[in-house]
Amino acid sequence: MHKELDDFFEDVITVRLTPERDGLDIIDQTLLPGIRKRICLRTKEEIWNAIRELKVRGAPAIGVAAAYGMAVTADHIQAEDFSAFYHALVEIKNYLASSRPTAVNLFWALNRMEQRALAEKEKSLDTVKAALFEEADRIREEDVAISRNIGELGFGLLKKLKKEGEPIGILTHCNAGTLATAKYGTATAPMYLALEHGWEGTDMHVYCDETRPLLQGARLTAYELCHAGITTTLQCDNMASVLMKSGKIHIVFTGCDRVAINGDSANKIGTNQVAILARHYGIPFYICAPSSTIDKSCPDGDHIPIEQRSPDEVTQMWYKERMAPEGVDVFNPAFDVTDHDLITGIITEKGVCHAPFAEDFARLKI
């Protein structure tokens, strides 16, 4: 299983540098599952568009893409001194930061790249540019380690809940899988670590919400779990309560794009209603979150900006003919906020946090 799993991860590397290290090589996730196509991004406009149009998506993967994007585009800056170089670098940073307003990893990665440049400012510009590539590589490597740690902690929860001879039922929403990170994913990491620890794909039964309107659960999560050999069922978002009531779901794992200091968590639209259902049916609900997604400057969910997306995603994007009348107003937020009191725990790479979350974040030095 290890070789098969390694081959799978190699096939679906989300973001990497080109062999010449002059561009980003990404999977265009808007084409999945029907077409698996890699595209090369070299300009800041191409990178901005790829993030904005969800060709690369998922908070950790966005952070990695932004870091590499900043390194690649900074490499082309022509400047006489560090001051001029830094001015151009900040312009690139601010431009890339405008692509997605909710994913805090985007800003975290860009700020980290800026700080690395400042730390090298007394050295030659060639050295500064090389340092940016080094920092981006480090961000990617750290993301792999972070996802693996989250997976180990989540796998520990699965082991406690699994009954001998029966698959454990897991529900997830949207895609917080390996396609959303450098490797393993966050919400899917416990499943992949289970395989690494010797479980069979049939020891788990993962139920994927399709995740309207962009269908990340159907197009991406179901795609990658099926390819990894894990028993997978796809359902419409409004079918989750039937599954929970029937006793088929034993635990819920989702990812997130930003966590407020009180534990309120922004994730793909529809996550909050899954948490409400899980609470009603007594099912543990866990957010899987790298500590970089915890925004200590954000007091609660009311302060998390929510991206509004195109009405076409709801009315006509997936259909041969328009499925709603012309002129109808469309409400299409990309995210919702799950209230902290609905969350059983937040699994970070440093440990599992419980309410009161601010105290646990401090205990783990997040």
Describe these PLM feature segments.
Residues 27, 65, 107-109, 171-175, ...:
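Short beta-strand segments
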Residues 35-46, 127, 164-168, 221, ...:
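Acidic-glycine-rich active-site phosphate/pyrophosphate-binding loop
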Residues 203-204, 210-366:
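Conserved phosphate- and dinucleotide-binding cores of soluble alpha/beta proteins
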Residues 40-44, 175-181, 261-266:
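Short, glycine-rich nucleotide/cofactor-binding loops
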Residues 49-56, 62, 273-276:
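Small-aliphatic-rich amphipathic alpha-helix that forms the alpha element of a beta-alpha
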Residues 39-55, 89, 168-172, 317-327:
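Short, hydrophobic/aliphatic alpha-helical segments
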Residues 2-45:
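Positively charged, low-complexity intrinsically disordered leader regions
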Residues 55-232:
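N-terminal active-site beta-alpha-beta segment that forms phosphate/nucleotide-binding
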